[in-house]
Amino acid sequence: MDQSNMTSLAEEKAMNTSSRNASLGSSHPPIPIVHWVIMSISPLGFVENGILLWFLCFRMRRNPFTVYITHLSIADISLLFCIFILSIDYALDYELSSGHHYTIVTLSVTFLFGYNTGLYLLTAISVERCLSVLYPIWYRCHRPKHQSAFVCALLWALSCLVTTMEYVMCIDSGEESHSRSDCRAVIIFIAILSFLVFTPLMLVSSTILVVKIRKNTWASHSSKLYIVIMVTIIIFLIFAMPMRVLYLLYYEYWSAFGNLHNISLLFSTINSSANPFIYFFVGSSKKKRFRESLKVVLTRAFKDEMQPRRQEGNGNTVSIETVV
């Protein structure tokens, strides 16, 4: 794999730099409008997710769902931070020195790390809510207390492993034939994991969830929570999923798909920035929108009527991980 493809932004910057050096006196090429939009949206999304993370960590009691949302916000924050710095770097058009080059690579890898984690977490959210509807007794009485935290830790570890494989085999590889074959193997593995495991799980569990909710009137009590889940997944599939497809194609067909890189980054930025807006508008009361405290709005959006319960020694049941 040609090392000039270590990051798509680095590739574009190198091409722009060489083009200017070849034509003396040429003016600085205009920054694509897409990068201006990214540099406008990503700080807003970063602040939104930061505020959301602060409320989830310090102002609200946790339930199984908010544990996942907390980790999803961390993944979105890391993604938005990296994409903002990459866009600023592209706009300033620094020379690609060795140290600067690897800084860009580090940011790009962290960006992929946040993206992969977001996909895995959304799948876990969808699957767990589906299980809570299919097996309500297990969910309320027998679900392990720290299952959400344990699943999140496993998914972060899986994301780290997948991202490291992608970096070592595809981004930081040389031009040797064995490196190219190793990269193809990693691409196939990631494609199977993303499009034949996690995405189908997300779609199937979401479909089952919608069907079960429509058939059960009791689900209306926590309908806002299900709306949050469904809208978040739909936004992810529309805006974020194309980026993974393009990134896998870049490694082999950069010349054909490289021009779509900026659009895929913009879509991914929109996805990560949209989540806090989804939580706010779904949790807001139509009659009191913009007049309620953020804590009240988030509590309503994340309220879980099917709170897990735990058996005590005296035979009584008590609720755990309730939301204020």
Swiss-Prot record:
> What InterPro entries does its record include?
GPCR_Rhodpsn (IPR000276), GPCR_Rhodpsn_7TM (IPR017452), MRGPCRFAMILY (IPR026234), Proto-oncogene_Mas (IPR000820)
In the UniProt record, which residues carry a glycan? N5, N16, N21
Gene Ontology biological-process entries: adenylate cyclase-activating G protein-coupled receptor signaling pathway; angiotensin-mediated vasodilation involved in regulation of systemic arterial blood pressure; G protein-coupled receptor signaling pathway; phospholipase C-activating angiotensin-activated signaling pathway; positive regulation of canonical NF-kappaB signal transduction; regulation of inflammatory response
The chain's Extracellular topological domains, given as residue ranges, are 1-35, 87-103, 172-184, 245-262
* GO cellular component annotations of the record: plasma membrane
* Membrane topology annotation: Multi-pass membrane protein
Q: Pfam families, from UniProt?
A: 7tm_1
Where exactly are the transmembrane stretches of this chain?
Answer: 36-60, 65-86, 104-127, 149-171, 185-205, 224-244, 263-283
Q: Which residues lie on this side of the membrane: Cytoplasmic?
A: 61-64, 128-148, 206-223, 284-324
Q: Where in the cell is it found?
A: Cell membrane
Molecular functions (GO terms): angiotensin receptor activity; G protein-coupled peptide receptor activity; peptide binding
Please provide the record's keywords in A-Z order. Answer: Cell membrane, G-protein coupled receptor, Glycoprotein, Membrane, Proto-oncogene, Receptor, Transducer, Transmembrane, Transmembrane helix
User: How does the record describe its quaternary structure?
Assistant: Interacts with AGTR1. Interacts with FLNA (via filamin repeat 21); increases PKA-mediated phosphorylation of FLNA.
State the family it belongs to: Belongs to the G-protein coupled receptor 1 family.
User: Could you tell me what this protein does?
Assistant: Acts specifically as a functional antagonist of AGTR1 (angiotensin-2 type 1 receptor), although it up-regulates AGTR1 receptor levels. Positive regulation of AGTR1 levels occurs through activation of the G-proteins GNA11 and GNAQ, and stimulation of the protein kinase C signaling cascade. The antagonist effect on AGTR1 function is probably due to AGTR1 being physically altered by MAS1. Receptor for angiotensin 1-7.
- Full protein name: Proto-oncogene Mas
